[in-house]
């Protein structure tokens, strides 16, 4: 080529031609052919410490290559899969370490389905409960034929995983702070009061940045009073970087909301979600359970036992989803609860996520799991809106005040009344948590009150 421009980095990479199957390059004057895949080109550039490539007379930065119409193929999930496998291995996950050791000689393993299918299963198994299930969905969408619908659902689901990952950490912090307040009083700052009160009272569903702001305030609160963190690895989070990543994810999702998204938006949000999950890799250290029932069992001359019936949320070692299990322990745990516990600890040592996370099926006395995260209060009557994570639909829970209408014996005998009573208990827990957490809050006057819209 007559017109060669010196690129930034230690090496010059010039794209000579692009075919359906390959990219022909000139690397420092030496011809080279690689697979036609954006991830493969990125890997080569990373290996050579090159920040740019040249095609004809134009220089493209790393961020521009994916956006330019160069005929380079772009495959969903490639970046996500490779980066998360490396992060999980660094976090100590033995199966990820073994996998990477086995494929070490295969430099482009992330472009071969016989390797990536195994890696994707390991990733979904590693991440806690509902996050692993949602990652499986993202990977399934990535395999679908390219369409406008695929692009939209991919962006939506990447955004949902980011939101739910931050929410899960916030719920663990709120629950732990609620427990801490049983024995000691803590004073909230003005900003903490404002953000936490908004969490309990807002009639509008929060976006990702709002959840990150709550996380920032809760971490500051725990640090100021030296309260033990519920997830010990939380001190490793770089909150400034998490804020920056979340801001990018929010902007990319906003493009979808305005119907301004393109194919490139999918790859950009996949990259940012990957960075967010690497920040929150601690979520691979925990498990989620939905406790369905506890049965007391004691025989003559034998110690008492508690038979725990629960659903292990997420993907198990055989890659089944939401597996029902039974365990026998010498102590009870809270029933009708979704709990979080460290993988290397007994589930009797847990964080009770209720009423912020509920299993709707448990409340309805139905089999299986239907996990819902608290979303907002209803705009008209202040009832509780919960988001069903499978499809982001809203389950509204009203307060029926059943104990004022019936005695407990009558409630237990009637299935419908008992179900409504169980939902009442969620309301009661939610209000108890709000009242205690905000008991010593700063009373500001700038909250937007939407209570009287329908009065």
Where are these regions (language model features)?
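Feature for intrinsically disordered/low-complexity regulatory segments and propeptides
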Residues: 65-248, 267-288, 298-319, 415-419, ...
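Histidine-centered catalytic/metal-binding microenvironments
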Residues: 253-272
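Long C-terminal appendages of very large multidomain proteins
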Residues: 297-455
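Long, low-complexity intrinsically disordered regions enriched in small/polar
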Residues: 1-60, 64
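Intrinsically disordered, low-complexity segments used for protein-protein interactions
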Residues: 25-27, 32, 36-43, 74, ...
